[in-house]
Swiss-Prot record:
Pathway membership, UniProt: Purine metabolism; AMP biosynthesis via salvage pathway; AMP from adenine: step 1/1
Subcellular location field: Cytoplasm
EC number: 2.4.2.7
Gene3D superfamilies recorded: 3.40.50.2020
Summary of subunit composition and partner proteins: Homodimer.
Keywords: Cytoplasm, Glycosyltransferase, Purine salvage, Transferase
GO cellular component: cytosol
Organism encoding this protein: Pseudomonas putida (strain ATCC 47054 / DSM 6125 / CFBP 8728 / NCIMB 11950 / KT2440)
Protein name: Adenine phosphoribosyltransferase
InterPro entries for the chain: Ade_phspho_trans (IPR005764), Adenine_PRTase (IPR050120), PRibTrfase_dom (IPR000836), PRTase-like (IPR029057)
Signal peptide: none
Length: 182
């Protein structure tokens, strides 16, 4: 975790009982409405990765696109989009996974990566790790390697970061929340 005097958590809105009862959803839209907050998040990731040895950035549909595209632009790296099933127009690789809400499928264009590529994968949040594990599996199926999985938020009680690390995927998050934290 990285921290300084900036209160990142204050820009992440808790939404109780969304999308279902008992869940506290972590809404990052206030972060994107704050130029200072967005700059802070981008700067933290850029500082971490500016000299890192990877070739591509992979961003998860949909909120991962927001920060992933900024970092790809700032680091001058190609951006690979990992989309929900049925959203990509060309030949795809598909990977099923479990989320905290049920089963889903993640897809990537089959020709977007190749052997020797190294991919930093981004999402807004790590909960169960299902989305990023599916992305890591897709990356590996292309012959590429996963450099690291990065997110703004970690929910460590849901074990996603632990699951990613157990699968050989290092993780980095800017902040974390307990499941009951408001």
């Amino acid at each position: 975790m990285h921290s300084d005097a900036f209160d990142l958590k204050a820009l992440i809105r808790p939404v109780v009982d969304f999308p279902k009862p008992g869940v506290i959803f972590r809404d990052i839209t206030p972060l994107f409405q704050s130029p200072r907050g967005l700059r802070y998040v981008a700067d933290q990731f850029i500082e971490r990765y500016v000299e890192a040895e990877f070739s591509h950035i992979g961003a998860m549909d949909a909120r991962g696109f927001l920060i992933g595209s900024i970092i790809a632009h700032q680091l001058n790296k190609p951006l690979i989009l990992f989309r929900k099933q049925g959203k990509l127009p060309a030949d795809v690789l598909s990977e099923g996974y479990q989320t905290e809400y049920g089963e889903a499928f993640l897809e990537v264009h089959a020709d977007s990566l190749c052997e020797g590529d190294s991919v930093l994968i981004f999402d807004d949040l790590i909960a169960t790790g299902g989305t990023l594990l599916a992305a890591a599996n897709l990356v590996r199926r292309t012959g590429a390697q996963v450099f690291e999985a990065a997110a703004i938020i970690d929910l460590p009680e849901l074990d996603g970061s632990r699951r990613l690390q157990a699968a050989g995927v290092p993780t980095f998050c800017l902040t974390e929340f307990s499941l009951s934290e408001y």
